[in-house]
Amino acid sequence: MADRVDWLQSQSGVCKVGVYSPGDNQHQDWKMDTSTDPVRVLSWLRKDLEKSTAGFQDSRFKPGESSFVEEVAYPVDQRKGFCVDYYNTTNKGSPGRLHFEMSHKENPSQGLISHVGNGGSIDEVSFYANRLTNLVIAMARKEINEKIHGAENKCVHQSLYMGDEPTPHKSLSTVASELVNETVTACSKNISSDKAPGSGDRASGSSQAPGLRYTSTLKIKESTKEGKCPDDKPGTKKSFFYKEVFESRNAGDAKEGGRSLPGDQKLFRTSPDNRPDDFSNSISQGIMTYANSVVSDMMVSIMKTLKIQVKDTTIATILLKKVLMKHAKEVVSDLIDSFMKNLHGVTGSLMTDTDFVSAVKRSFFSHGSQKATDIMDAMLGKLYNVMFAKKFPENIRRARDKSESYSLISTKSRAGDPKLSNLNFAMKSESKLKENLFSTCKLEKEKTCAETLGEHIIKEGLHMWHKSQQKSPGLERAAKLGNAPQEVSFECPDPCEANPPHQPQPPENFANFMCDSDSWAKDLIVSALLLIQYHLAQGGKMDAQSFLEAAASTNFPTNKPPPPSPVVQDECKLKSPPHKICDQEQTEKKDLMSVIFNFIRNLLSETIFKSSRNCESNVHEQNTQEEEIHPCERPKTPCERPITPPAPKFCEDEEATGGALSGLTKMVANQLDNCMNGQMVEHLMDSVMKLCLIIAKSCDSPLSELGEEKCGDASRPNSAFPDNLYECLPVKGTGTAEALLQNAYLTIHNELRGLSGQPPEGCEIPKVIVSNHNLADTVQNKQLQAVLQWVAASELNVPILYFAGDDEGIQEKLLQLSATAVEKGRSVGEVLQSVLRYEKERQLDEAVGNVTRLQLLDWLMANL
């Protein structure tokens, strides 16, 4: 059944309810399965009803809203859920029968609580983990500031940028500062509505550019390490620190270190005491520092992936030569190492608890990953605009479109390295550069779906033909083609069918034409396309005769060629032979094209527009000609076939005519025998069959409607198959495609109706059995669950729903209710609307303190 079900407006009739009592000799093999449609539908229905009772009357189920898992939990109580049990009953001499059980159980109330600390809930663990993470980040930030602003460090580069003041001179450092500032500002605006827990007011404050200053600092620290031996020279280690920090001008007027910055501008630093939330300030500044460090680490691999040779003064020069290439990985490694050490010092004994450590790491890396990913996305966009958004010179512009894809992948964590645990960032940026000399040309009219599909299939057919082209001697092909049309005789001519022309044709001219094999592929598919497009343009409302006459007047006439699509015209021009084609060859080509056209026209007429006269007079001939036709639809006017099965002479005649290829199909196949290989013919015929489905799907009498009209009510449990089911199906034994269609239709019919054919002797029809193991639940919930199961089974066209294992009289009441509903002709939508009214009345009574007198089943018996 469809995924979208309008339960409240459903007109499906309700099913009957029975009591299931298993026999003594039935073995029950219980198995768990969670991929059942009835349970999924029941979970959707449950959620929709709960939304409706809560006041969301306009809510409807959307696909993807709930993913079905082993247990579908209640939104109100997390301890309850649905589950499904399957069991197979196997008897000797009979196939196994599949039964399923829908159960409602309770889980222990402490099943989902983590054993952390003194038994606190998982929310408390998350709260304290976030607080400790903020503290660790603040301590790491303090450590970084001490390293960067220490007296032993040598400042290599420092720049300052203010949002509301004019930019300084355009130096290399200024370009870097502008880029980073704009990137972080854009990132702050984008993520202001999606802040991580505990992020405070950094995101909202950073979106106001005039109130912010941004500082980028690059310092170097040299440390001397003595050698193990006295004669060894002391080793020198250089560490670079790159810091980028937001600073607010409204927090104070203190100078940094008592010194003025370049350009007579003052750097204001915010004191933690002036902030309302110290943890928000810590996590904001700490994550910004961490994210910028991670961005530096990412840009190393990005530049290596791009393999860019930069020779100008863009931002890539600074990122490549001064900051990123050598020192970003060390900064990130030191930062994470510092985090872990400080975390161990702060938490103490809690670090021995693996669950607590995992929670802290997950919280920390989720925050850091989100911020770093947002900043990375903005920086990549800006970097691409600087490096690639340039106008190409005229000498490299091409007539065709250019498409370049750059995959930007960051470094990932090394295996077995605890410092880089869970550190895995990836970013992809794809861009397409389209340069076309003919971009100023007038835009063509938008093509329809049929035209687009036709051109695509034409291109694919020609492409396959070029790969599989095998040339044969022209005389042999011509002889084969000249003799083929005479093999077919029409016993009962029909005005809708046109016989192929029989004209003497010189073999040598045929050889010249047949060498141009592309025209065969093109003409075969274009013929069907033009017919289909014309039919779609008319809306599929014209009769068979007028359709074929109009198609014949617009396709392959004797005085002018057909109007193919523009793509086909271009291909014909490119593939025309260089020598001049004589008039005789043109005439022969038109004759051959008319052969193909007549075949397509007869194909469509036999597939779609068979009239009653054709069915009565040409049953023998058309039955042999339908084997290659895809039997998707039947005629607009139902054919009057006899109720009895057809005589076996059809199958014998089919074998006599050559098996799968017969009639016009065999004629054309013989014509194309030596012109194309068998695989190419198969591809072309398959393409034409698929195109014919377009007309078939647009007809007014689909197979399902014919099945319902002719087969009657197939939902009756008394008859597994209606007697006249085969009236609306293809005859057995008339072809592989029709046999597959017949089997598919019967399978779908059985699945929708809950039947599987006439059961063998001694076997029972499969039963849908429901067993609810919710002993601790209330009677009200049990009754509501039983009603919902009954409604879901009715929507799935289950004839009888059996309940097993009831001790509180619910089965007896539900039996009476179902009998009453079936007698009154109630639908699924009416039952659900009554359930909603009862739930509203019950909630109103509980709100004012009244006690509901009637249970759900009793109320439905009185008011349904």
Swiss-Prot record:
Residues 190-235, 251-281, 619-638 are annotated as: Disordered. Structural component of sperm fibrous sheath. Required for the formation of the subcellular structure of the sperm flagellum, sperm motility and male fertility. Phosphorylated by STK33 during sperm flagella assembly. Phosphorylated on tyrosine. Residues 219-235, 627-638 have a biased composition (Basic and acidic residues). Residues 125-138 are annotated as: PKA-RII subunit binding domain. It comes from the Eukaryota. The keyword tRNA processing does not apply. This is A-kinase anchor protein 3. One of its GO terms (cellular component) is sperm midpiece. RII-binding site, predicted to form an amphipathic helix, could participate in protein-protein interactions with a complementary surface on the R-subunit dimer. Interacts with ROPN1 and ROPN1L. Interacts with QRICH2. SMART domains: AKAP_110. Keywords: Cell projection, Cilium, Cytoplasmic vesicle, Flagellum, Phosphoprotein. Disruption phenotype: Male mice are sterile due to sperm morphology abnormalities. The absence of Akap3 affects the integrity of sperm structure, causing mislocalizations of sperm proteins.
